[in-house]
Design a protein with these regions (language model features):
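Enriched for short, Lys/Arg-rich terminal
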Residues: 2-4, 58-92
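A short, surface-exposed loop/turn module that caps and links secondary-structure elements
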Residues: 31-56
């Protein structure tokens, strides 16, 4: 199975609004996710109550939500949204 990566327009817009330090940390986290999604620093895990959404950590406060789907023999990893924990997981 081949892993493919893409991003949503919302993710792209949110990424452009990050400060320089967080932007660099995000790029590093994405590169690490592409090469080794199980790396402990990413804290990659499935989001409870969803079928195909996962999260990775950029740093202690910023998260990336990823939608993982399948298409033929490909695993599609869509960078869905990015933001602080409270931004991506609003209080219930």
């Amino acid at each position: 199975m081949t892993r493919r990566f893409k991003s949503t327009r919302k993710f792209d817009k949110q990424f452009k609004q990050l400060d320089q330090k967080t932007s660099k940390q995000t790029e590093k986290a994405i590169e690490l996710f592409i090469s080794d999604p199980s790396h402990p620093s990413l804290r990659y895990k499935k989001i409870q109550g969803t079928d195909n959404f996962y999260e990775i950590s950029v740093n202690m406060s910023v998260r990336i939500i990823i939608e993982v789907t399948s298409e033929a023999n490909d695993q599609i990893n869509t960078l869905y949204i990015i933001g602080t924990h409270d931004d991506v997981f609003p209080p219930k």
